C-alpha cells in the first residue's frame, strides 16, 4: 500500500524536525504546518551554520541562533529528518475525543432524540418511547361529547 507525500507530512506534524537548506544552513524546530509548495513552518526554531575557517586557523566553528517561528521556503529545502518526538503536554487539560459525552463547556450537537430502541436486527423500532406516545383514552381531559362542535357556550357566562 502506498502512502502519499501529504500523509507522510501530516504524520510528522508537531515533531521536532531538522531541515537542511541548499546554502548549508540547518533549521531545527517543531514542525507546525506545510502547504502545496512544501513551505514549512517551524516553531521554537534554531539556526545552525558552519563557519568557514579564516586563513591561518585550522578549526571551523558552528554558529547557533534562536529564531522562534520561521517559515522556510520549500524551494530551498534539501532534506528534512525527524530530530525528536512531539513534546508532551502533561500540564494541559485532557480534552474529550470527538463523539464523547458532553459536559459543561463542551459544545455538542443536539442529536435526533432518543437512541434507537433495541429490537430485531434490521427492523425499525416498535413504537415511540414511553411518555412520548400521546394521551391514553379515558385519562384526563373532557370526554368525546364535550369536544363536538356546537356543544354550548362557556359555562356560567353569556356569549360575547
UniProtKB/Swiss-Prot annotation:
It is found in: Nucleus; Cytoplasm, Cytosol. GO terms for molecular function: RNA binding; snRNP binding. The keyword RNA-binding applies. CDD domains: Sm_B. It holds the Pfam family LSM. Its main location: nucleus. Keywords: Cytoplasm, mRNA processing, mRNA splicing, Nucleus, Ribonucleoprotein, RNA-binding, Spliceosome. Residues 80-160 are annotated as: Disordered. GO terms for biological process: mRNA splicing, via spliceosome. GO terms for cellular component: catalytic step 2 spliceosome; cytoplasm; cytosol; U1 snRNP; U2 snRNP; U2-type prespliceosome; U4 snRNP; U4/U6 x U5 tri-snRNP complex. SUPFAM superfamilies: Sm-like ribonucleoproteins. InterPro entries: LSM_dom_sf (IPR010920), Sm (IPR047575), Sm_dom_euk/arc (IPR001163), snRNP_SmB/NAA38-like (IPR050914). PROSITE patterns: SM. Belongs to the snRNP SmB/SmN family. Plays a role in pre-mRNA splicing as a core component of the spliceosomal U1, U2, U4 and U5 small nuclear ribonucleoproteins (snRNPs), the building blocks of the spliceosome. This is Probable small nuclear ribonucleoprotein-associated protein B. It comes from Caenorhabditis elegans.
Amino acid at each position: 500500500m502506498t502512502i502519499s507525500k501529504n500523509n507522510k507530512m501530516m504524520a510528522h506534524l508537531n515533531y521536532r524536525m531538522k531541515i537542511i537548506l541548499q546554502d548549508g544552513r540547518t533549521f531545527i524546530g517543531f514542525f507546525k504546518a506545510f502547504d502545496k509548495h512544501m513551505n514549512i513552518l517551524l516553531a521554537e526554531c534554531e539556526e545552525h551554520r558552519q563557519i568557514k575557517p579564516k586563513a591561518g586557523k585550522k578549526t571551523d566553528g558552528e554558529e547557533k541562533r534562536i529564531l522562534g517561528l520561521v517559515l522556510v521556503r520549500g524551494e530551498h529545502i534539501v532534506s528534512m529528518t525527524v530530530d525528536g518526538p512531539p513534546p508532551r503536554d502533561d500540564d494541559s487539560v485532557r480534552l474529550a475525543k470527538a463523539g464523547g459525552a458532553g459536559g459543561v463547556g463542551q459544545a455538542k450537537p443536539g442529536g435526533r432524540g432518543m437512541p434507537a430502541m433495541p429490537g430485531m436486527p434490521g427492523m425499525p423500532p416498535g413504537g415511540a418511547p414511553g411518555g412520548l406516545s400521546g394521551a391514553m383514552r379515558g385519562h384526563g381531559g373532557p370526554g368525546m361529547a364535550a369536544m363536538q362542535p356546537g356543544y354550548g357556550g362557556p359555562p356560567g357566562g353569556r356569549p360575547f
